[in-house]
Amino acid sequence: TGVQTCALPIYPSRVTRQTVSEFVGSLTRDKLSPASTARCLSAVRGFFRFLSQERLIRTSPVTDVTVPRRWLRLPKTLTADEVDRLLRVAAGKMPEDLRDAAMLELLYATGLRVSELVGLEQAQVNLAVGYVLVRGKGDKQRVVPMGEPARRKLDAYLEEARPVLLKKRTAPKMFVTRRGGGLTRQGFWKLLRVRARQASIAKSISPHMLRHSFATHLLDHGADLRSVQAMLGHADIATTQIYTHVERARLKQLHRERFPRKARRLRRRNP
């Protein structure tokens, strides 16, 4: 795969807000995807934040520049009911059932990336206090609470399923197969699709959809944006702000479907 280059054509000290806006516009004209455009803007914003912190420039010209709303691709999420159905399907007592139940519950409870989930090691999980130490992008670490339901599912998996899957072998990875190795990203994608079908979820589901659902449902229930940013491991809060657009879009759709005056016309009274 190629490396995407995000570069402004002049010296940083001469960059203005208009320069950055024109740069973002050029990315669109070059037919860069909305996600790639947002990533480029995030990289530029981080660079100028660094220059500002080092006092090499007075103010960042990127602070108020955003990707136009029409470019944003809203993340797809599951409803609360769909999540409940998905988390209930792996209710069996087979080792794989207990493992799948623990993985699904933990993924939704923490908003981990799939790579972070399958790469999780036992030493990173503290069941006593209910926290996970996550190694994210760029080897950055963050601590994320898991909640009681996920803690119980993990405890059951560790006590009843993991020893059976490993037999007498040892493995550093938390989630393992009967061969003794760690479950791969592809393996988790496969089991997620199987469990989604069992839960009668018609959507094309992906692990990242559970991460999106985690963030969206937290914000729906009053969580503040900075806390969600910290739990997701986003370097730039602009990345987290996309979830506020999801809530606005949902409310707009709800209003369109449920507002009682949607199909009525106001009648003018005769003077």
Named regions from a protein language model:
Residues 1-5:
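Positively charged, low-complexity/disordered segments
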Residues 7-271:
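Conserved catalytic core of the tyrosine transesterase superfamily
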